[in-house]
Structure formats: structure tokens, C-alpha cells
Swiss-Prot record:
Catalyzes the transfer of the phosphoribosyl group of 5-phosphorylribose-1-pyrophosphate (PRPP) to anthranilate to yield N-(5'-phosphoribosyl)-anthranilate (PRA). SUPFAM superfamilies: Nucleoside phosphorylase/phosphoribosyltransferase catalytic domain, Nucleoside phosphorylase/phosphoribosyltransferase N-terminal domain. Keywords: Amino-acid biosynthesis, Aromatic amino acid biosynthesis, Glycosyltransferase, Magnesium, Metal-binding, Transferase, Tryptophan biosynthesis. Binds 2 magnesium ions per monomer. This is Anthranilate phosphoribosyltransferase. InterPro entries: Anthranilate_Pribosyl_Tfrase, Glycosyl_Trfase_fam3, Glycosyl_Trfase_fam3_N_dom, Glycosyl_Trfase_fam3_N_dom_sf, Nuc_phospho_transferase. NCBIfam families: trpD. Its cofactor is Mg(2+). Anthranilate 1 binds at residue 85. The gene is trpD.
């Protein structure tokens, strides 16, 4: 079969027709290798966005991004989980998932956290980790050591996806969301089989969870807060797409289901990484309120995804215990010391 040409692919998007799996693999390899011109890369990614990317197109693109990535080899992945968001929710909340990372590890799961610098928020996960004193530029083997010994490994996305340099200028100049915004969370370099993923639009809940299903994930929760948050929200109901035992089901959860008080995002907003760090540290040091509640809720969901907890309720209880005991704060201190020692 003759490979699809970029011009044919562009025409498909204009006609709102799907680019099939093998064609998308070929096209994505051209993009990631720098073979495709910036003009065609921009045209095709914009065309895909306008027609709306299909599960098949997203799955194929994620497979190629994984092919081109620098991987972290983790041998025991039974309770390995990633907690990640697509970003783009515009809520400017503090680093909820980064804070939850320490709670999750303290409660017995292992976290391979995959993230970058700020895209739409005031503070990205890499910005937050750096502000806390974590060394984020480690080699893949060192990150694997961190996961094994501390229970947390932070993978700074640009270090693991060098081929993205071929796309970065196009993405920056376009300034609109493209397929790459939803590929990052699907391409964990440590191959975490379990994931809690927040998305920026309700349509993506069903799409991303089915892409994860096709990509071989084991236990996944894809969530969208009805108030627009790409986390499990305290301010509204949260749509959930869950992949478990090979099957997908979709449902909605509410804070009061877990005995938590509803709270809007205003109390969680920050203006810069300094404010985000202060709120994050407050949670780890025992401050009560909406920030603590939303961290526990999301950490609890990740513990359920990691198969450490039997249910969301059990996960929440374990997360609350990890914070109350001081174990989550100790986990942060352990990670800082360990990464600084490795980087020395």
C-alpha cells in the first residue's frame, strides 16, 4: 500500500474524514523526524483539531510519540501510577497533582510523574518540583532508581521527548490547542500501566480513556470537573471514564459522595510558582480546607487507579492518613535529598 501523502492527509481533514491507523503512524513519524515541513505540520495538526481527532488517530500518534521517546525502565509496575493533566483548563490553581504525588507515594503506590513547565497555568509541575528543591534533570536510570527507592520519579518531558523539538516552533506560533496537547499524558516514558488523567473538555473523557484502552493501560481514570477543572473537582460534579479489567464505564461523582464540602476554585488559585509552593507546602504541613480536600480526593483516586486502594472512598481515607501522619511531607523531603544526591 502506498503511504499517504501529507497533501492527501490534509485533504482528509478538510473533508472531515478519518486518517486511518497505519496512515497516521506514517504521518506522525514524518512529523516527529522533522521530515514534514513546518507549513504542512501546522496545516495537518490544525485540520485534525478542526475536524476533531478520533480515538484511532490519537492512539496511533501516541504510539509514535512513545517510539521516539527516551524511556525509563521500571521492572515492578504493579502499583506504578501517573497522575497528569492535559492542562489548558485556565483555572490557575496551585499544583494539585504535584502535591498529590507525595501523598500517593506515602500511601504505598509508586508514581512516575511526567510533566513540563507551565503551558496554561501559573506554575507547571516541573516549575513546582524545582521550587520544592527536587532535581528534575536526571538520567533515565537515575529516575528508575528514584522510583524504586523513594517511590517517586519525576520525568521532565523535554528530556524524554527530544523529537518534539521538531514540533515546538509550530505549536508556539499557532498558539492554539492541537493533538499534541492530548498526547503528552498518553506517553509516560516509564510506561505506567495505571493513570489518573485530567482533561480540559468533557468530550475528551470518553476519547482518552478509550485511547488508553487501545494503548494497553490496565487501570485508568480520566476525569473532567464540570466547572472546567482538569482534576477531580470540589466545585462541581466530575465526569469519570474508568478503564478496569479491560472494560470502560463512564459515571459522575460529587464531593458530597465522599463527605467533602463543596468549594469553588477561587480558594485554590495562585498567581505564580511562589504562591503555588506556599499552598502546596501548607497542605503537606497540615493546613485544613479546600486545598487539602482536593489533594486528598485526587490522591485517593490515583491510589485506586494504582490498585493500592479498593475504591475511591478507600483511596481518600488512605490519602487523608498519609497527610495526617506527616508521611507525605517526609516523602517530599526524601525525594529532594535523594535527587540532590544523585545530581551531585
Amino acid at each position: 500500500m502506498t503511504p499517504i501523502t501529507p497533501q492527501e492527509a490534509l485533504q482528509r481533514t478538510i473533508e472531515h474524514r478519518e486518517i486511518f491507523h497505519d496512515e497516521m503512524l506514517h504521518l506522525m513519524r514524518m512529523i516527529m523526524s522533522g521530515e514534514l515541513s513546518p507549513v504542512m505540520t501546522a496545516a495537518i495538526t490544525t485540520g485534525l483539531r478542526v475536524k476533531k481527532e478520533t480515538i484511532g488517530e490519537i492512539t496511533a500518534a501516541a504510539q509514535v510519540m512513545r517510539e521516539f521517546s527516551h524511556k525509563v525502565q521500571v521492572h515492578d509496575t504493579k502499583h506504578l501510577v501517573d497522575i497528569v493533566g492535559t492542562g489548558g483548563d485556565g483555572a490557575n490553581t496551585f499544583n494539585i497533582s504535584t502535591c498529590a504525588t507525595f501523598v500517593i507515594a506515602a500511601a504505598g503506590a509508586k508514581v512516575s510523574k511526567h510533566g513540563g513547565r507551565s503551558v496554561s497555568s501559573k506554575s507547571g509541575s516541573a516549575d513546582a518540583m524545582e521550587a520544592l528543591g527536587v532535581h528534575i534533570n536526571l538520567q533515565p536510570a537515575q529516575i528508575a532508581q528514584c522510583i524504586g527507592d523513594v517511590g517517586i520519579g519525576f520525568m521532565f518531558a523535554p528530556n524524554h521527548h527530544p523529537a518534539m523539538k521538531n514540533v515546538a516552533p509550530v505549536r508556539k506560533e499557532l498558539g492554539v490547542r492541537t493533538i499534541f496537547n492530548i498526547l503528552g499524558p498518553l506517553t509516560n516514558p516509564a510506561g505506567a500501566p495505571n493513570i489518573l488523567m485530567g482533561v480540559f473538555h468533557e468530550d475528551l473523557v470518553g476519547i482518552q480513556v478509550r485511547a488508553l484502552q487501545r494503548l494497553g493501560a490496565e487501570h485508568a481514570l480520566v476525569v473532567y470537573g464540570r466547572d472546567g477543572l482538569d482534576e477531580i473537582s470540589l466545585g462541581a460534579g466530575t465526569l469519570v471514564g474508568e478503564l478496569k479489567d479491560g472494560a470502560v464505564r463512564e459515571y459522575e461523582i460529587h464531593p458530597e459522595d465522599f463527605g467533602l464540602r463543596m468549594a469553588g476554585t477561587r480558594a485554590l488559585r495562585v498567581e505564580n510558582p511562589t504562591e503555588s509552593k506556599a499552598m502546596l507546602m501548607g497542605v503537606l504541613q497540615g493546613d485544613e480546607g479546600p486545598a487539602r480536600d482536593i489533594v486528598c480526593l485526587n490522591a485517593g483516586a490515583a491510589l485506586y487507579a494504582a490498585n493500592v486502594a479498593d475504591s475511591l472512598e478507600d483511596g481518600l481515607r488512605r490519602a487523608q492518613q498519609a497527610l495526617a501522619s506527616g508521611a507525605a511531607l517526609a516523602k517530599l523531603q526524601q525525594l529532594v535529598a535523594y535527587t540532590q544526591k544523585l545530581a551531585a
